[in-house]
Amino acid sequence: MNTQTTLLQASRWKPWEPVLWLLAFAAPLVLPSHALIINEIAIVALFAVSLDLVLGYTGIVSLGHAAFFGMGAYSAALFAKHIHPDPLVGMVFAVGTSTVLGALCSLTVMRGTDLTRLMVTLGIGLILMELANKLDWLTGGADGLQGVMMGPVLGQFEFDLYGRTAAFYSLTVLLLCFLLARRFVHSPLGGTLKAIDKAVRYAKEMV
């Protein structure tokens, strides 16, 4: 059995996985009064998926993961406020800014050991948090960004106070990002990263 066959078998869905996703998407309909909470759960779950991709599969320890999450959130909000309120375009812009930030931080983070990465990522997170609080003319500071109005998704689905559209939007983004992360993990590159992580662990055990 070659490597590609092994990766393909590992990427196949378990029987219970589609059921879990169907239950997640049914939740805003079954529990409409809790749609806002479901939206928050989907957002935190997306954060967990991205952190698991970095820590669980590649073994890179990070204490500043929230910095990239916050960069994306502020980028999308500022884009909607000053340029265009379309949530999909804003999401693409947020992904771009977070990617640029990650690429810049990687120049420092990837040069150190685990302890160095911990301190550097923690420092990056604290610096960006302090900037978000101090640059109140841009970010709103501790009061948060005001006056952000998101347009309808695909020009059809308006965001409202009940949070149903937001819940479905966040769940859809979560599912798409989960599929991308899953595909990456079970790709040859993902297999290489996992192999490197295991090799480092075995080497530490032998010392």
Feature map (PLM): residue ranges:
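Transmembrane alpha-helices and adjacent helix-loop boundaries
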Residues: M1-V207
